[in-house]
Amino acid sequence: MENIENGILTLLFENNEVKIRTINSEPYFDLENVCEILEIENPRRAKERLDEQGVYFLFDYWSSKSQRKDFISESNLYKLILQSHRLENIKFAVWITSEVSPIFIRNKVAKKIIKDLEELRTKDLEELRRTQKS
């Protein structure tokens, strides 16, 4: 299942929600969701072991109670997976690399193609204007 609401993509991994937010064109994962899937009991303590630069927070204004939500970078996600020492979590890592990451890679490629086409169109229009003036 795929759902985008308030700029957050929600996917399902084995009936568990994984909320993903794009920050600076990179995927960031809801720390609480990740900890639940990896069976990490204390997300706050898990966050302390992560690279601070790969942790962003947002305030969840759209739910009934406004709360702070932490989102972690893909590298921090893998750090948590590797630190968990649970063989079952390999399935989650495989799902991320085979199903989730390609979504963002395709999105980056599409944005680059669109940008290149817009630049090409601008150059063509400029060239057309120059030839019409001559």
Language-model features: locations:
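An anion-engaging/catalytic patch
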Residues: M1-E119
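Periodic self-assembly scaffolds
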Residues: K115-S134
